[in-house]
């Protein structure tokens, strides 16, 4: 069985998302809205999920019209993440877990449906010209960057390290 580029990207995006989920699950509950010399934990998680969701979308129009966004319009409201301003909203753990579930399904569907030709096409979701293939790898790095940021916070607060997830979805 030959492993495709789509499968590799999907497995690595899922591993990064699972690492972020591990952060949400292991963050001490009283710390979810606390700042630690940067943004509150819940804002970092939301930012990471938001751009996962955004970059896996075909266009801004389809991004805004997703059922998940419509059902949670009070949370997405003004889409502050797309503006050049400091975020102000805080997010509850239950919502963050729902958003993780939404992103997990979107990763699986997007990478199962995309063709080799589409991977080489320009990704319209970025101002800078970049292929979808490179955008997905950049997205994986972005997710892992923030998971590491939050994982270090958790380790400092609890003394516990995150478990390494090599490939695919795994829960601890």
Tell what function each PLM region has.
Residues 1-8, 51-106, 110, 118-122, ...:
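Short, helix-capping/interhelical loops that line the mouth of catalytic, cofactor-
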Residues 8, 39-43, 95, 131-138:
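Amphipathic alpha-helical recognition patches that constitute DNA-binding helices
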Residues 13-20, 41-56, 97-107, 139-150:
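Alpha-helical transition-metal enzyme core signature, strongest for iron centers
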Residues 21-36, 104-140, 157-171:
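Acidic interhelical loop/turn segments
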Residues 44, 74, 89, 135-136:
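Alpha-helical interaction segments
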Residues 153:
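A short helix-coil junction within the Rossmann-fold of NAD(P)-dependent oxidoreductases
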């Amino acid at each position: 069985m030959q492993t495709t580029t789509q499968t590799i990207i999907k497995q690595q995006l899922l591993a990064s998302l699972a690492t972020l989920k591990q952060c949400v699950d292991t963050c001490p509950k009283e710390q979810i809205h606390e700042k630690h010399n940067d943004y509150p934990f819940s804002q970092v998680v939301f930012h990471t999920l938001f751009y996962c969701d955004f970059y896996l979308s075909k266009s801004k129009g389809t991004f805004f019209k997703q059922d998940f966004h419509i059902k949670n319009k009070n949370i997405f409201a003004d889409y502050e993440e797309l503006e050049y301003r400091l975020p102000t909203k805080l997010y509850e753990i239950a919502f963050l877990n729902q958003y993780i579930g939404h992103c997990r399904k979107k990763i699986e569907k997007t990478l199962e449906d995309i063709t080799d030709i589409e991977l080489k096409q320009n990704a319209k979701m970025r101002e800078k010209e970049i292929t979808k293939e490179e955008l997905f790898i950049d997205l994986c790095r972005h997710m892992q960057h923030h998971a590491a940021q939050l994982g270090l916070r958790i380790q400092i607060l609890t003394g516990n390290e995150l478990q390494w997830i090599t490939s695919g979805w795994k829960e601890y």
